[in-house]
C-alpha cells in the first residue's frame, strides 16, 4: 500500500464551461472550522464536482491508491493557496471547512462521498475546487516494508560508507518503480539533485521515525 505522491502531486486543472460564472452559495456555520488546524494535515486530493442531487461530492485523489482518503472519517476542505505561497494547510486557511464523512467509496478513479451537513447539490457545488486534507494520524497503517511517500519527504539519505547524499525532497513514479529525488548543495552553493531508485537492489534501511535512509549509492553516481 505504498502511497503514490500523497499530497505532492499537482492537481489537474479545473475547467469551467465558457460563459458559465460561479454561483456563490453561503456555507453554513456548522461546516466552518475556526479552531487551529491540526499540524499533521496532508493534502490528498481536491473536490472535482458534485455527485448526484443529495449533496455527495466527487474527489479527485492525488494518489492512485486512495486508501488513506477512504479510511479517514474527517476531511478538511481548504481553498487553494494564493499564487506564490507554499501549498500548506495554513496557506489555505481562509474559511476552512471540516466535514465528517458518513459514506465514501471509489468510483471510476475518483472517490465519491457523503458528508454530514452537505445535504443538497448547490452546497456540494460550492465546495468544488477545494483541496481535501486529512490527518496523517488517520492514514491506515502500511504493511511491512511499505511506506507512505509523505513519510519519506525530509529523510536524510546516506550510503553504506556513511557519506551524506542529501535529503529527500520529492518522489517520482516512472511506471516501473519509484525514484527518490535527493536534494543536496553543490560546491558553488547551487542546488543539486540525485535520483535514487527506491527499489530493494539499492535500499539498505528505511527508518521513517528517525528520518534516515541508507542506500547502496555513490556520491559520483
Swiss-Prot record:
It is found in: Cytoplasm. GO terms for biological process: ribosomal small subunit biogenesis; rRNA processing. Keywords: Chaperone, Cytoplasm, Ribosome biogenesis, rRNA processing. GO terms for cellular component: cytoplasm; ribosome. The keyword Chaperone applies. Residues 1-23 are annotated as: Disordered. The keyword Zinc does not apply. Residues 144-221 form the PRC barrel domain. One of its GO terms (molecular function) is ribosome binding. Binds ribosomal protein uS19. Belongs to the RimM family. NCBIfam families: 16S_RimM. An accessory protein needed during the final step in the assembly of 30S ribosomal subunit, possibly for assembly of the head region. Essential for efficient processing of 16S rRNA. May be needed both before and after RbfA during the maturation of 16S rRNA. It has affinity for free ribosomal 30S subunits but not for 70S ribosomes. The PRC barrel domain binds ribosomal protein uS19. This is Ribosome maturation factor RimM. It comes from Cupriavidus pinatubonensis (strain JMP 134 / LMG 1197). The gene is rimM.
Amino acid at each position: 500500500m505504498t502511497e503514490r505522491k500523497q499530497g505532492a502531486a499537482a492537481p489537474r486543472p479545473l475547467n469551467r464551461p465558457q460563459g458559465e460564472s460561479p454561483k456563490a452559495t453561503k456555507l453554513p456555520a456548522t461546516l466552518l472550522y475556526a479552531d487551529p488546524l491540526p499540524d499533521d494535515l496532508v493534502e490528498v486530493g481536491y473536490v472535482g464536482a458534485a455527485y448526484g442531487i443529495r449533496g455527495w461530492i466527487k474527489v479527485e485523489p492525488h494518489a492512485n491508491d486512495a486508501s488513506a482518503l477512504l479510511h479517514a472519517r474527517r476531511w478538511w476542505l481548504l481553498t487553494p493557496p494564493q499564487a506564490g505561497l507554499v501549498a500548506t494547510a495554513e496557506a489555505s486557511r481562509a474559511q476552512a471547512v471540516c466535514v465528517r464523512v458518513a459514506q465514501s467509496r471509489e468510483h471510476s478513479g475518483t472517490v465519491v462521498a457523503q458528508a454530514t451537513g452537505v445535504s443538497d447539490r448547490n452546497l456540494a457545488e460550492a465546495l468544488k475546487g477545494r483541496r481535501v486534507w486529512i490527518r496523517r494520524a488517520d492514514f491506515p497503517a502500511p504493511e511491512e516494508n511499505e511506506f507512505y511517500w509523505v513519510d519519506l519527504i525530509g529523510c536524510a539519505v546516506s550510503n553504506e560508507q556513511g557519506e551524506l547524499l542529501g535529503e529527500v525532497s520529492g518522489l517520482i513514479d516512472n511506471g516501473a518503480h519509484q525514484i527518490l529525488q535527493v536534494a543536496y548543495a553543490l560546491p558553488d552553493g547551487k542546488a543539486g539533485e540525485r535520483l535514487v531508485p527506491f527499489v530493494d537492489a539499492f535500499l539498505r534501511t528505511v527508518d521513517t521515525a528517525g528520518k534516515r535512509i541508507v542506500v547502496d549509492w555513490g556520491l559520483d553516481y
